[in-house]
Amino acid sequence: LDEQERSPPCRLESLMLECAPSMSHPALRAIIFDFNGVIADDETAHFIAFQEALREDGLHLTKEEYYGRYLGMDERNCLAALLADRADGPNPDREQRIHKRKASLFYAYTQRQTPPLFPGVIRLITRAMQQYRLAIASGGRREQILRALRGTSIEHAFRVLVSAEDIAIGKPDPAIYRYTLERLNARRQQAELPVRPQECVVVEDSVAGIAAGRAADMKVVGVATTYPAEHLTRAHLVLPSLEEVSLDRLEALFTERD
């Protein structure tokens, strides 16, 4: 995972992308993974850290509120929305204070116990990296994601990592997925054609993330690791976990109608 390349696509690339839909039927070429709740089993740790940081600042957050209202947002927008719901308008200083405390609490938690990767993650990504371009698009912080991957066999599987530091507007806005695809195309090898949105699969665990993936014109797989499956019905495919996800099932999405 190298430093991000922010240069806009060249005119030739834009022309190739514009012409590509007429040249072939879309087929799977890239897989973009959310991280928290999809790759790493750490949503509970994030909630506990948020809850404690807010409690120290005189605010209360229930598990039902967190999962029902705020999960899926990046940390910055989550805090802004939470304080807007509970306080008298925006308060950047308070947001920054709580954000720093939450990060400190989460770091301490993960130092004591590294959040595990979900079952099936290593198997799926090890196979997928041989055939497709892989990326992470997460509202989590880059340092936390890199720490969770460090020392695993998939640490270097992803061509691109987009995190909360890279995007001003979080999910359900599609900006994070559009930007991730732009980065993937900027890093393609010389012989590779640009990937179109219609050739991407997004793997998500949240309602907001599924909405973002669909708005980016990508296929979406919902994994019911965080929400019940019945909450994820806007995904093109809903499965209990990544253990149930195979490359054949992902490829089959491109032969089916929405």
Predicted regions and their residues:
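Active-site neighborhood of HAD-like aspartate-dependent phosphohydrolases
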Residues: 24-68
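Conserved SAM-binding loop
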Residues: 39, 134-137, 169, 202
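Asp-based, Mg2+/Mn2+-dependent phosphohydrolase catalytic module
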Residues: 17-30, 126, 142, 146-258
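Short, acidic loop-to-helix structural element flanking the phosphoryl-transfer center
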Residues: 108-136, 142, 146
